[in-house]
Amino acid sequence: AKEMAGTVLATGFPFKQKHHIEPYLKMFQSMFIECADIRRAGAPALDLAYVAAGRIDGYWEIGLKPWETAAGELLAKEAGAIVTDFVGGHNYENSGNIVVANPRVLKEMLGKIRENLPDSLAK
């Protein structure tokens, strides 16, 4: 929990996939308890740019399209952030489930996501 103490995270609600609200809220709660704050800008590209700029430490969201993340993904990677899907792989463009964070907090974020991950989101 030390890695997430004091961190500011960002996310977006799965409004296109409301059937995933229960596991999403469990992920949210699990992270909210450990971090300093969770923000919602409403634009994945902006959240990813904020990770790249160091304004937020990590970001996750369910069900995004590649065009929502492409530019921000490049910025985040160039700044040293790691971009994965919910199981730590590289299928985020196909699954739409993305986690982006600095290396210091990524492992803990993935752990909290996996604890609450239904099989339907583990692809």
Residue ranges, per PLM feature:
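An extended, acidic
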Residues: 1-123
